[in-house]
Amino acid sequence: MAGNGVFVDIIEGDVFKYYSEGEWKKSASGKSVAIINPTTRKTQYKVQACTQEEVNKVMEVAKTAQKSWAKTPLWKRAELLHKAAAILKEHKAPIAECLVKEIAKPAKDAVTEVVRSGDLVSYTAEEGVRILGEGKFLVSDSFPGNERTKYCLTSKIPLGVILAIPPFNYPVNLAVSKIAPALIAGNSLVLKPPTQGAVACLHMVHCFHLAGFPKGLISCVTGKGSEIGDFLTMHPGVHCISFTGGDTGVAISKKAGMIPLQMELGGKDACIVLEDADLDLAAGSIVKGGFSYSGQRCTAVKVVLVMESVADALVEKVNAKVAKLTVGPPEDDCDITPVVSESSANFIEGLVMDAKQKNATFCQQYKREGNLIWPLLLDNVRPDMRIAWEEPFGPVLPVIRINSVEEGIHHCNASNFGLQGCVFTKDINKAILISDAMETGTVQINSAPARGPDHFPFQGIKDSGIGSQGITNSINMMTKVKTTVINLPTPSYTMG
């Protein structure tokens, strides 16, 4: 159970502590933040409401710890990361339990997230040793007008203190995707977990604590965004921000100042289905891509753009698969579980009601109980409907019928988002042309959008983000280049 066994130190009474200076602490504020169980809609956990003074202290110790950590050999950093990964996977059950109760993630998917996170940490350790152990060597006479009198050596050095802000939907996986690259690169790390998912993150951080990382190197502060959110993102002690979430990231980017930013801010991932597509493959991918974890994924299929000539057949196949989806509590491993909050459910319902008023075709009856929304496919959606453009982050999927590939590409590119897209066709040449034309960070051919595997580059354009993720790219963006030039009195090739 959460807060028991090896995790007993992270809770006192009914409030989970925050992590600073290698210790679990109670906030001087004396206040806590409630975490509501999406299924019961009752308080499940409480976390500390940290103060700005406590944030200042965290930043101070993170700066000091980073200086020593940067001098720690790469192999030693990797060794500790491998140890943390093993501990994380060993204690997957209580962490998964938190995910079930905090964010209504189906039980099996919750376990998968923790195991995947451990694998990510281990892979990052290995990749970091490879890419950070290499540098570049340049000679001056490769540039016109120069003799070989200068040798240039370049290496990658840490940025300093990294601020990591993961989202609610994958709080553990998207936290470690920031933590592990930061640490292997020689940085210190301050984690601000989402409110929903905070307790799972605290358990994960304790696994790093048990692995024996130096005090102050990793910190985790919890609290209200209104009190410490801007204070964290604008803090002069932060040298890089890695954020995954919604349009809050736009505000962060405007306030952050001259530091590197890595941001993934959502998407309206389009699925284009052509006449020659394998409709069974497309239908299966659409249902999995659109309804997994109740559609609460940045890379979920958010709109289907299907050629009119095959639309009826595709919709029929999708509806048949939707009918087989199970609906209920996450403890029962249902396909569709409650969305994360009442406000999210209300937003989704607003999109549905707008589509209803504008005469979209409801392939299923709209049904909602509390935060639980039954899966819904909306056919004959038009561009004047909100659901055609806005990201529902729920189990509602619009279908827009198109008469040409160009029409589908135009709709995709007219979106303010540009995270991922996909195309289903048996013509690889046409698929590549469409991929080049789609204004998205990634295009999947004959598969639904997806973030993984975790070592693949992952990025969005337009309002979907800044920079690129994926293990290698994250390590690189959390470092800077250091150049050392050796100056010779005479060209090196003159001897002999």
UniProtKB/Swiss-Prot annotation:
UniProt binding sites for NAD(+): 245-249
Protein name as annotated: NADP-dependent glyceraldehyde-3-phosphate dehydrogenase
Catalysed reactions listed for this entry: D-glyceraldehyde 3-phosphate + NADP(+) + H2O = (2R)-3-phosphoglycerate + NADPH + 2 H(+)
UniProt: NADP(+) binding residues: 192, 195, 230, 391
Record has Protease as a keyword: no
CC terms in the record's Gene Ontology section: cytoplasm
Keywords: Cytoplasm, NADP, Oxidoreductase
Alphabetized PANTHER family for the sequence: ALDEHYDE DEHYDROGENASE
UniProt-annotated binding residues for substrate: 116, 169-170, 297-299, 451
Family of the protein in this entry: Belongs to the aldehyde dehydrogenase family.
Site (Transition state stabilizer): 169
Main subcellular localisation: cytoplasm
Annotated InterPro entries: Ald_DH/histidinol_DH, Ald_DH_C, Ald_DH_CS_CYS, Ald_DH_CS_GLU, Ald_DH_N, Aldehyde_DH_dom, ALDH-related_metabolic_enz
Active site: residue positions: 264 (proton acceptor), 298 (nucleophile)
A GO molecular function held by the record: lactaldehyde dehydrogenase (NAD+) activity
Role this protein plays: Important as a means of generating NADPH for biosynthetic reactions.
Compartment(s) where it occurs, according to its Swiss-Prot or TrEMBL record: Cytoplasm
EC number: 1.2.1.9
Keyword Oxidoreductase: yes
Superkingdom, taxonomy of origin: Eukaryota
Organism, as annotated: Nicotiana plumbaginifolia (Leadwort-leaved tobacco)
